[in-house]
Amino acid sequence: MAKRNRKSGWKRAGAGNTINRTFKSTLFIMLFEDKNNLLELYNAMTGKHYTDPKLLKINTLKNAIYMSMRNDLSFLIDGRLSLYEHQSTYNPNLPLRFLFYISQLYSGMTKNDNLYGTAAVKLPPPEFIIFYNGEKEMPERMVRKLSDLYTFKTEEIRLELETVMLNISGDNNAPLKRACRTLRDYAVYTDKIREYTKTMELEEAVELAIRECLSEGILKEFLEKHRAEAKEMSIFEYNQERHMMQEREAAWNEGREAGRQEGMEENLREIIRNMIQQGLSDEQIISYCNITNAELEKYKKG
């Protein structure tokens, strides 16, 4: 029996099935907080064949102090520190957010070490992965760097952080999804919701997606155990995604009216430049940035 706590969280009782929420979670987090699912995903990402979930040490930021910048998933295994993030709305600022996350994680790992001593403090090498399944068409694989956000380019970059975004919508990254059934099922489920919302109300679309997935064996065990919570999370996430898109559009319009067009255009120009470097087609760039073909040509020349 699931009980809602006073902070809009969740607490589910049961051996080996404890889920505590003091924040509004996402379906992606809920699925991959399960160590069996997370190990399956890590194996698919790395080509490893680990079978013991106990090898995973999950260290996702959960301290209330850092609640405003809580990351989705981070864990240690194989001497590496992996940070996985899910995005349904493309965000070019994720390299900066990952910098904040890794700083807090390293700080926690070394709190008992002598940082002023003569012995070198050893750190696990990190990797930063973003799983994207938004409505906007994006490339199958895209690299974003912290230096993409710098106000100007320098010959020698003193601080860099590289992220890899993997598009899991539709037919993208099919080999990865074949290697990780949970990721594939999650992608199918969210694709169904997005498709059905084109012709029906959100709650009805989510309910239909859940029924179909149960009958097709997609996330079957998970949805049987957590159907009500999964439905609520899905509705919340989709509403949040639409809200973020509306906020971004409103901010753009506000920037025009407030006379900040030059700064916003420079930011858009940098985004377009990066998309071109990543191999996106003109049609994809026009769709994502909501610009005309003539405007795209202007940004290319600028």
Protein language model regions, located:
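Elongated, amphipathic alpha-helical interaction scaffolds
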Residues: 2-302
